[in-house]
């Protein structure tokens, strides 16, 4: 079996599901176990400067094999899988030469259907790797890890000219902490690419501005038979609050460059209620306006309440649109575009309706757009990837590395 797939299957065997609302990084021990395994693998493969931080970030260097000065570049992927779906006991299925139609996911009624996922129509003849319907696959982002390491090994064995290349594998990307303890100075690259995208050709340097919003509503509970003028129902206030938000500006009604408000959870009693939202927008001004709107709604709904009853709102910015930083370094995008074209791939430039480690790293001084892995339908049982997509990602990583050295020689 191809070594690329061997690596991928090994990595997905580790349960690295991240946990939200955990103070420690990494948030789960499985991530640390995978990090330790990668550290040993990189040492065995002969990489230099292999390190594993206290927070589970693995770094290593593939030393230059050319005599002229070349900018140090980097490639980054993340160890963890989504907290939204189990990543324990992943059992990948290989579907060779896909001929169309439904693909049974394990034993049972679960299928991967082109009716629900029309992209399958474009993948006839490809080798698909799917789940067994019980877990996610973990292509997000263990495919990225496998692709980066495989690309580095091939660069070395085929003696393709390249400068120093830094690689890193980070924890807790899925819960927004991947870059929190990433040491940019230690990584010491002029720019990098996260390998954390989707289908073949994806090249992304725009992402949401993102914030989390926690709302606490304190009411007053008395017997409903004698409640008139006294009871303040926190749940009623919560529903009033939510109804003040625009109905069509939610994830299920938005796409492309549209922003949204998303109610993730609501719980409570008459006495007390809690709501958790996320706010997303590509435009910084619109992003700030959305946050202000949420504060204004809290003031309106809470107006006139008894002094012991109130609405408290806490807004935390998570990350910003890396476009602000990337456009200062247009050659980084142009280089990736050219590498894809050289690999017979049409670059697909589109905004990330989410975030990556690269977003935070770009604001820490490491410009870091995102390139594809070849995977689809992340964060659930319908996740899959194509072997052809993985091989293309490896080829692009290698070509970016080669082009960087080639252009440095010519300049």
UniProtKB/Swiss-Prot annotation:
Entry GO CC: cytosol
Residues binding Zn(2+) 1: 78, 140, 196
SUPFAM superfamilies documented for this protein: Bacterial exopeptidase dimerisation domain, Zn-dependent exopeptidases
Subcellular compartments: Cytoplasm
Keywords: Aminopeptidase, Cytoplasm, Hydrolase, Metal-binding, Metalloprotease, Protease, Zinc
Active site annotation, chain numbering: 80, 173 (proton acceptor)
Any single GO BP term: peptide catabolic process
Enzyme class label: hydrolase
Reaction catalyzed: Release of the N-terminal residue from a tripeptide
A molecular function (GO) term: zinc ion binding
Keyword Protease on entry: yes
PROSITE patterns the UniProt entry points to: ARGE_DAPE_CPG2_1, ARGE_DAPE_CPG2_2
Highest taxon of the lineage: Bacteria
Cofactor note: Binds 2 Zn(2+) ions per subunit.
Ligand binding (Zn(2+) 2): 140, 174, 379
CC cofactor: Zn(2+)
EC number: 3.4.11.4
Broad class of the protein's primary localization: cytoplasm
Role description: Cleaves the N-terminal amino acid of tripeptides.
Similarity-based family: Belongs to the peptidase M20B family.
Record-given protein name: Peptidase T
This protein's encoding gene: pepT
């Amino acid at each position: 079996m191809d070594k690329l797939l061997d690596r991928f299957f090994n990595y997905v065997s580790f349960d690295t599901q991240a946990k939200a609302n955990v103070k420690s990084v990494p948030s789960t021990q499985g991530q640390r176990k995978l990090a330790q395994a990668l550290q040993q693998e990189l040492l065995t493969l002969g990489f230099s400067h292999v390190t594993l931080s206290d927070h589970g970030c693995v770094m290593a260097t593939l030393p230059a094999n050319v005599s002229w000065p070349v900018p140090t570049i980097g490639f980054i992927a993340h160890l963890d899988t989504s907290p939204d779906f189990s990543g324990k006991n992943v059992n990948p299925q290989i579907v060779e030469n896909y001929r169309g139609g439904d693909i049974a996911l394990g034993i049972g009624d679960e299928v991967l259907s082109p009716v629900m996922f029309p992209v399958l129509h474009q993948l006839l003849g490809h080798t698909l790797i799917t789940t067994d319907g019980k877990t996610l696959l973990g292509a997000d982002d263990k495919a990225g890890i496998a692709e980066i390491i495989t690309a580095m090994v091939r660069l070395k064995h085929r003696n393709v000219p390249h400068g120093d290349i830094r690689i890193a594998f980070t924890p807790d990307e899925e819960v927004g902490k991947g870059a929190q303890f990433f040491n940019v100075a230690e990584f010491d690259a002029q720019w990098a690419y996260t390998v954390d995208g989707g289908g073949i050709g994806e090249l992304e340097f725009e992402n949401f501005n993102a914030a989390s919003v926690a709302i606490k509503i304190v009411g007053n509970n008395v017997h409903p038979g004698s409640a008139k003028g006294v009871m303040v129902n926190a749940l009623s206030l919560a529903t009033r609050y939510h109804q003040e938000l625009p109905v069509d500006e939610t994830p299920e009604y938005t796409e492309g460059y549209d922003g949204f408000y998303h109610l993730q959870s609501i719980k409570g009693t008459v006495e007390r209620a809690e709501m958790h939202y996320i706010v997303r927008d590509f435009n910084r001004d619109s992003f700030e306006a959305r946050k202000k709107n949420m504060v204004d709604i809290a003031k309106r709904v809470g107006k006139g309440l008894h002094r012991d009853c109130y609405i408290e709102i806490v807004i935390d910015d998570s990350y910003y649109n890396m476009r602000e930083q990337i456009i200062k370094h247009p050659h980084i995008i142009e280089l990736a575009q050219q590498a894809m074209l050289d690999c017979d791939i049409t670059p697909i430039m589109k905004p990330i309706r989410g975030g990556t480690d690269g977003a935070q790293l770009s604001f820490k001084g490491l410009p870091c757009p995102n390139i594809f892995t070849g995977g689809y339908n992340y964060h659930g049982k319908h996740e899959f990837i194509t072997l052809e997509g993985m091989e293309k990602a490896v080829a692009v990583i290698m070509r970016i590395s080669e082009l960087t050295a080639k252009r440095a020689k010519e300049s």
